[in-house]
């Protein structure tokens, strides 16, 4: 009995020694999906992912200034590539983990029609977008308005959020009547679950390919490598699919 208890204690100590922690900077559009992935990762690996949500552009600046992030889940491909060229991400570690979708959304039923014709009506109220200078979903929103020939009509009605999470908050709270948000923020199992929305056709803007990268600070952290490997696996991919992402 004593030998069994000693063996169990040793096993638990070994597992504890192997378990680690990884600091993850995740694009704001990932919202609930990344929390589900982090929970599943902890359950399946024993490692803990500490997730910070924010705009990709601001994370880029923070990593340059020495922020202790070890993994970046960006909302674009350019930022991980730039970090790699700057020596701040591990060469060859980048991969596309998701393709985001944009949706024009209102928290109210019947405001946004299934074809987005509300945009062609005289502007009523504010239209929320993420800051296009730092947020890829904000750039996609501007590209969409431009491709529809409606950017000038809506320019004075735009309200810019710091990131896509804040853009969603503006609409959900009623501070903006409509807004361009990430499909992942308002969808469950392929359909908009609250309010009304128009899923923007993919040809209306450049693809929102979202890349992950192992940052230089995480190069020697087994938990960071394990998290990226988990992100490639079916458990994480299933969560992302359910959240409306393309893979």
Pin down the residues of each PLM region:
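Bacterial N-terminal signal peptides that target proteins for export
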Residues: 1-6
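Exported/periplasmic ABC-transporter solute-binding proteins
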Residues: 20-53, 57-67, 74-77, 81-247
């Amino acid at each position: 009995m004593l030998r069994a208890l000693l063996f169990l204690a040793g096993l638990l100590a070994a597992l504890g020694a192997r378990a680690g922690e990884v600091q993850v900077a995740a694009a704001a559009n990932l919202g609930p999906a990344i929390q589900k992935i982090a929970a599943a990762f902890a359950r399946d690996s024993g490692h803990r992912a500490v997730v910070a949500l924010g705009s990709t552009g601001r994370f880029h600046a923070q990593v340059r200034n020495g922020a202790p992030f070890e993994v970046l889940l960006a909302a674009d491909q350019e930022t991980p590539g730039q970090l790699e060229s700057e020596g701040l991400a591990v060469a060859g570690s980048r991969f596309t983990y998701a393709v985001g979708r944009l949706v024009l959304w209102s928290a109210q039923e019947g405001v946004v029609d299934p074809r987005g014709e509300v945009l062609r009506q005289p502007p009523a109220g504010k239209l929320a977008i993420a800051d296009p200078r730092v947020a890829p979903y904000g750039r996609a929103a501007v590209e969409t308005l431009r491709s529809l020939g409606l950017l000038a009509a809506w320019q004075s009605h735009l309200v810019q959020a710091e990131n896509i999470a804040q853009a969603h908050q503006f609409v959900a709270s009623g501070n903006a009547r409509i807004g361009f948000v990430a499909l992942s923020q308002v969808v469950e199992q392929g359909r908009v679950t609250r309010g009304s929305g128009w899923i923007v056709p993919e040809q209306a803007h450049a693809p929102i390919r979202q890349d992950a990268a192992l940052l230089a600070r995480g190069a020697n952290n087994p938990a960071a490598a394990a998290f990226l490997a988990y992100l490639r696996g079916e458990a994480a991919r299933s969560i992302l699919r359910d959240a409306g992402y393309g893979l």
